C-alpha cells in the first residue's frame, strides 16, 4: 500500500456516499402528477400579489460578495492568532501585508461607492 491509499479510499467512499444520497430521492419519490397549485407561490392562502421571482437590486449581490470575501479573511486570522507565539517575524509581516492588501481593497470599494445605498 502506498502512502496515498487512505486519500484514495476517502475519495472513493465520499463519491459513493454522494451518489447514494443523490439516488435515494429518486428511489422513494412517488410518480404522481403535480398540480398547478403545488407549483405556485404560497402567500397565506391568498392569490399571489406579484411574481415570486422578482428581481433584486445588484447592490444586494455586491454586499453579499463583499461579506464573503471579508468573512474568509477572518478564517485566515484565527490560525494566525493561535500560532502567533510560534511564528517568527516573517509570519507576522506576511500577515500584516495580507491585512494591508485587504484594507486597500476595502478602501477602494468604499471610494468607488460600493457600500453606499443612496
Swiss-Prot record:
GO molecular function: NADH dehydrogenase (ubiquinone) activity
Membrane topology type: Multi-pass membrane protein
Protein EC: 7.1.1.2
GO cellular component: mitochondrial membrane; NADH dehydrogenase complex
Keyword line: Electron transport, Membrane, Mitochondrion, NAD, Respiratory chain, Translocase, Transmembrane, Transmembrane helix, Transport, Ubiquinone
Enzyme class, spelled out: translocase
Main location per the UniProt record: mitochondrion
Compartments, record wording: Mitochondrion membrane
UniProt protein name: NADH-ubiquinone oxidoreductase chain 3
Native species: Allium cepa
Amino acid at each position: 500500500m502506498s502512502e496515498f491509499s487512505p486519500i484514495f479510499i476517502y475519495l472513493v467512499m465520499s463519491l459513493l456516499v454522494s451518489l447514494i444520497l443523490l439516488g435515494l430521492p429518486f428511489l422513494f419519490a412517488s410518480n404522481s402528477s403535480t398540480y398547478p397549485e403545488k407549483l405556485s407561490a404560497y402567500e397565506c392562502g391568498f392569490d399571489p400579489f406579484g411574481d415570486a421571482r422578482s428581481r433584486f437590486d445588484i447592490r444586494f449581490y455586491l454586499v453579499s460578495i463583499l461579506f464573503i470575501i471579508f468573512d474568509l479573511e477572518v478564517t485566515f486570522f484565527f490560525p494566525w492568532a493561535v500560532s502567533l507565539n510560534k511564528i517568527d517575524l516573517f509570519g507576522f509581516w506576511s500577515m500584516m501585508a495580507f491585512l494591508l492588501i485587504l484594507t486597500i481593497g476595502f478602501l477602494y470599494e468604499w471610494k468607488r461607492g460600493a457600500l453606499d445605498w443612496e
